[in-house]
Amino acid sequence: MRKTDINKYVGSHRKKDGAATTAKSIGHIAIKGLSTLVTILIITGIIVSVSLVSFILSMKDESMNYDLHKLQLNYTSFIYVNGANDDSSNPVKYQSLYSSENRVWVDYDKIPAAMKNAIVAIEDKRFWEHKGVDWRRTLGAVTTLFSKGSSYGGSTITQQLIKNVTGDKDVSLTRKAKEIFRALNLEKKYSKEEILAAYLNIVNFGSGSNGVQAAANLYFGKNIENCDIAECAAIAGITQNPAAYSPLVHPDANRKRQQTVLNEMHDQGKITDAEYKTAMAESEHMKFVGKKSENVIDNVPIWN
C-alpha cells in the first residue's frame, strides 16, 4: 500500500472516530439536560403539591361566622291606620317605608313551589344533589376562563348566598377558594331548605326589592304565596342581572329572561306541558303594577 493510501485510510478513520465522539458527547449532554429538566419538574411538582395541600388545609375549616337565622338585615317597616271606610277597628296598611333595601322576610313554607323551582332551575339545577359546590360547573368555569379568557358562572345558590351575606365580591382565586370551602361547610350546618329560604329572602330582585316577598309586592301587588308560575319565573329571571332584567325598567329583557326560566323549568320536569303553555302565553302580556323607588326614604329607623 502506498503512503498516500495509508494516510487517507488513517485520516478517514480519525474522522469517523471524531464524529462518533462528537455524537456521543451530544448524546451525553442531551441525556444530562433531560435528566436535569425532569429533576426540576419533579421538584417543582413537589413544591406546588405541598403548597396546594397547605393552602387546602388552611381553608378547609373556613366558614362565614354568620347565623342564617340571626342575620343583620334591613327590613321594610309598615304604617297602619284604623279602617276609614268601615266601622271595624281592624288596622289597614297605609304605607311601606324602607331605606336602601325593601325587604319583607317570608318563611319557607309560604314560598310557593313554583318560586323555588324557578330559581333552582335557572340558577343551580343540581342544587338538591350537590354538597354546596357543583364541581361540574366549577370545572366548566375554570376551563372557560383559561380557554376563552371570559367568565362563566359556576357559583351555586349556596355560594351566591355566601357572597351576598359576606359582601366578599373581589375577583381572586383566594376569595373563590374561601367561598368554596364556606359553601361546603355551610351545607354541613344547614339544610337545603334553610339555605334556599335565606337565599330567596336576601338576594336583589331589582328596583330596590330584596327577597321574593318584596319583589312580588312591587311587581305584582300581591304576596309571593299568591304568585303563579309565570310571575315566579319573571321574578327568578331578575337575579342574574337585576339592573338589566328589572321588569319596571326593561320589560322586554325581563320577558325574554322569564321565558328562558320557563324553558328550563319545563326541560327539567318542574312544570307540565299544559302549565308551560299557559305560562308562556301569560308571559306575552304581563302587567307590572309597581312604581320604581316608591316610598323610599333616607335613614329610616327600622322597627318591627
Residue ranges and their predicted role:
Residues R2-N304:
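Juxtamembrane regions of bacterial inner-membrane/periplasmic proteins
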